[in-house]
């Protein structure tokens, strides 16, 4: 998923998506351990998506905290 698409989501939606991706990564790790995983590249992609989501959540919280500081 691209960062531009993720920036349109709210923080709650991003956290929900992060939770889904972490669950998927957990399942992929089990498949890898059992030798069932066919597409190892998917694990790398999921990790990067999680990192993107966490970065955007941080950006949004920083922007909202800056906005509140200017109002006071």
From Swiss-Prot:
Keywords: Ribonucleoprotein, Ribosomal protein. GO terms for biological process: translation. One of its GO terms (cellular component) is cytosolic large ribosomal subunit. Pfam families: Ribosomal_L29. GO terms for molecular function: structural constituent of ribosome. Belongs to the universal ribosomal protein uL29 family. This is Large ribosomal subunit protein uL29. It comes from Thermodesulfovibrio yellowstonii (strain ATCC 51303 / DSM 11347 / YP87). The lineage of its organism: Bacteria, Pseudomonadati, Nitrospirota, Thermodesulfovibrionia, Thermodesulfovibrionales. The gene is rpmC.
């Amino acid at each position: 998923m691209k960062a531009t698409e993720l920036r349109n989501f709210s923080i709650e939606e991003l956290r929900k998506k992060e939770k889904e991706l972490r669950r998927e990564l957990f399942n992929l790790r089990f498949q890898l351990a059992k030798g069932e995983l066919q597409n190892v590249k998917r694990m790398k992609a999921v990790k990067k998506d999680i990192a993107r989501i966490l970065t955007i959540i941080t950006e949004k919280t920083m922007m909202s905290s800056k906005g509140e500081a200017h109002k006071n």
